[in-house]
């Protein structure tokens, strides 16, 4: 019974990734229609990556459930070790292409936290109905003590390094903390912005329109390291401003699709991809499935 419940929830994480890549059109991002601003990956690359990561999603939630009483830092270390194995498996499946590195990190923590939360709330295990928004908030808050040390330990001593990873370079150059920062704050972009917005949208619109509007909203607010890495601070600010204007127009679904298709070409021409917004889109979908919003 327990394993079946944990398996079903881990499959929601996979489903969230499938929904994210399938949502179309997504400016600058890989979707069903084209590869966006990416010349090294396609829709099929994402499928390969998701299949490789799927067994680890189950391992994350089972680890959180099994070690729910452990000190948060010890649980984090277990999840990170699993996450590193998952990352290696992903790169093997994609021939070295980074499809889901940051998202895998976030999913490891949130699935681990989901498992730990379920261990502490057994009624959700016996009657797996809709998670409340309070359940979602509690899960995200469990991540905070697991990752309170992360910025200092991972990014606090970079002055001694000569070569940086992509995330480290963003921190050194711009102070962008990326997924580490989001996790260490308890995923407040999710709990305070993305999910409240999506709950409102889904109560007023059909699912696809709500998802497209959520993407635009995220692109208008997210500190997007991918955009900044590719185009610098001004390019990122420009995309945010463009998306704020698009939101204000309150377009019909048909017109919104046309606007996003047009903006896709604009971002392709500038080689810009809002990968940070895409990751948070997938994480929002995960909790939307738990809450049965979708």
From Swiss-Prot:
* Ranges in a coiled coil: none
Q: What is this protein called?
A: Probable 2-(5''-triphosphoribosyl)-3'-dephosphocoenzyme-A synthase
Tell me what gene encodes this.
citG
Gene3D superfamilies per UniProt: Triphosphoribosyl-dephospho-CoA protein
- Catalytic activity reported: 3'-dephospho-CoA + ATP = 2'-(5''-triphospho-alpha-D-ribosyl)-3'-dephospho-CoA + adenine
The record lists the organism as: Streptococcus pyogenes serotype M3 (strain ATCC BAA-595 / MGAS315)
Q: Which GO terms describe its biological process?
A: prosthetic group biosynthetic process
- According to its UniProt record, this protein's enzyme class is transferase
Q: Specify whether ATP-binding is a keyword of the entry.
A: yes
Q: What are its E.C. numbers? A: 2.4.2.52
Q: Which domain of life is it from?
A: Bacteria
The entry lists its GO molecular-function terms as: ATP binding; triphosphoribosyl-dephospho-CoA synthase activity
Traced from the root, the source organism's taxonomic lineage reads: Bacteria, Bacillati, Bacillota, Bacilli, Lactobacillales
């Amino acid at each position: 019974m327990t394993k079946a419940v944990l398996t079903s929830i881990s499959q929601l994480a996979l489903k969230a990734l499938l929904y994210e890549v399938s949502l179309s059109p997504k400016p600058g991002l890989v979707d069903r229609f084209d590869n966006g601003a990416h010349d090294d990956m396609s829709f099929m690359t994402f499928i390969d990556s998701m299949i490789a990561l799927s067994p680890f999603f189950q391992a994350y939630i089972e680890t959180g459930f099994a070690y729910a009483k452990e000190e948060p830092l010890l649980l984090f270390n277990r999840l990170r070790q699993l996450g590193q194995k998952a990352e290696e498996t992903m790169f093997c499946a994609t021939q070295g292409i980074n499809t889901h590195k940051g998202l895998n990190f976030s999913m490891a923590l949130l699935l681990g936290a989901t498992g730990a939360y379920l261990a502490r709330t057994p009624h959700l295990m016996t009657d797996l109905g809709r998670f409340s928004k309070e359940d979602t908030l509690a899960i995200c808050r469990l991540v905070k003590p697991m990752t309170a040390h992360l910025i200092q330990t991972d990014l606090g001593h970079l002055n001694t390094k000569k070569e940086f990873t992509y995330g480290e370079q963003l921190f050194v150059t711009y102070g962008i903390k990326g997924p580490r920062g989001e996790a260490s704050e308890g995923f407040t972009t999710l709990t305070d912005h993305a999910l409240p917005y999506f709950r409102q949208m889904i109560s007023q619109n059909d699912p696809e329109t709500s998802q497209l509007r959520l993407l635009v909203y995220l692109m208008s607010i997210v500190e997007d390291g991918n955009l900044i890495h590719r185009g610098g601070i001004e390019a990122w600010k420009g995309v945010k401003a463009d998306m704020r204007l698009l939101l204000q127009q309150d377009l019909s679904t048909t017109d919104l699709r046309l606007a996003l298709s047009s903006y896709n070409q604009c971002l392709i021409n500038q080689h810009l991809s809002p990968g940070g917004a895409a990751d948070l889109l997938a994480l929002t979908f995960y909790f939307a499935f738990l809450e049965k919003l979708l």
